[in-house]
Amino acid sequence: MGIVVGRSGYGKTHTLKQYARLPRVAYVECDDTMSARDLVEAIERTLGLPSGYGTIWKRVNGIRDFFNTNRGYLLIIDEADKLVSKYTQKKMEILRAIYDQSDVGVVIAGEPKLEAAIKTYLVRMANRVDFYASLHGLSEQEVADYLQGYDITPDALEELQARARNRQTGCFRLLDRTLSNVRRILAASGGETITLKIIQQASGMMML
């Protein structure tokens, strides 16, 4: 079992969805409204199983049977921090039961609070974790590489790097959204050089 944590906008979901294109990789994206039954149905759907009509226990057994018959699968549960709180751990216990009784690898991903929630409320799951990765965002060189090909003034480059790497609010998503608006402004004005003023204009189009 593996755990991947990182702040919103760091690229977890995009990366996991790309990986899920590989054979025998099943991907489920969770949300706050999911019940235990919804989670089971989402796993059934991503595996191509017909949605069951029995109890959750019977349907989970069907999922276990699938993994034990079709060996070599990886099950990715994204946004898993939305499944657990101090009031409910049932949905995560379903995942632990599938992992314990199936021949399947499981990767659970979410925001940093997922790590604390598992350690606090799900000790039996925590001691099953073989691999743990905490994403730290883009490096300065990665930002520079991403911006290659753009004509950027030095102060504009510094601002874009801050948007990508600031520990409080910086992330790839903010950098990408800013650049999208910058391109719109340049296209409308016929310009080619990204300046600090243009970045400020681009920011004015966003909710920051």
Show where each model-derived region lies.
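Conserved catalytic segments around the Walker B and adjacent sensor/switch elements
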Residues: 2, 20-32
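Sensor-1/coupling segment of RecA-like P-loop NTPase cores
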Residues: 2-8, 98-122
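C-terminal alpha-helical "lid" subdomain
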Residues: 9-17, 137, 141-208
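Conserved catalytic network of the ASCE P-loop NTPase/AAA+ motor domain
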Residues: 20, 65-70, 97-104, 122-128
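Conserved NTP-binding/hydrolysis module of P-loop NTPases
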Residues: 24-27, 35-53
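A short helix-turn-beta junction within AAA+ P-loop NTPase domains corresponding to the substrate/partner-engaging
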Residues: 25, 120-137
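Central P-loop NTPase core of STAND/AAA+ ATPases
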Residues: 45-70
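Conserved P-loop NTPase "ATPase switch" module shared by AAA+ and STAND
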Residues: 66-88
